[in-house]
Amino acid sequence: MPELNLARGAVLAITGESGCGKSTLLETLGLLLAPEALGQYRLGNQDIAALLAADDQVALADVRARSLGFVLQSGGLLPFLKVRDNINLPRRLLGLSNKSAHVERAIDALHLGPLLDKLPQALSIGERQRVACVRAIAHQPQLLLADEPTAALDPHNARQLFELLLGLVDELGLSALVVSHDWSLVGSFGLPRLNAVNLPGETRFETVH
């Protein structure tokens, strides 16, 4: 795959047909899967490739907790926690205060205030995804990884959520990789993208200008 260099505030979309390795790439960069081979991987000042080579699981877990934020296609909310507690979970795990100005701004921007005391089962799919977006940025990670965040939504709500997510990334100065099968949605925002192409025995990621 081509070399990736993401500046703070930059967003790169990864597109392609189902089953072509988009999510696998995201999970590998998110340190959820171990790569079969790896050249360089740096996240800010951290040499992730060296940590992987040393199999330093403690350090890798710390990177996942502090430097990475995830938005899963399913939302991934814990069903036994209310919305407010789901959002604050990454901060609690790091020993951070539940009070955060940027989290409150994100809650307001995504219109989640009336939902904070509800359990995930009481929310619509779109509402759960909005909660997942706020949770992913609650601890101000360096890199946001979003796997098909709009896949279960109708076109109107998909566009609205995508716009809100990009707004949060811009405001907080994060880097973001967003996997999407919706080329038209990605294109409408003018995002640079990698397109995953299935080839015999491999997946190739091609830069699309």
Model segments located where?
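Conserved ABC ATPase "signature" region
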Residues: 47, 99-115
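ABC ATPase NBD coupling module
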Residues: 48-69
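Short coil-to-helix segment of the ABC ATPase nucleotide-binding domain corresponding to the Q-loop/switch region
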Residues: 81-88
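Conserved ABC ATPase signature
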Residues: 119-129
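Hydrophobic anchor residue at the start of the ABC signature
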Residues: 133
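A short, proline-enriched helix->beta-strand linker immediately N-terminal to the Walker B motif
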Residues: 138-142
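Catalytic Walker B motif of ABC-type/P-loop ATPase nucleotide-binding domains
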Residues: 144-147
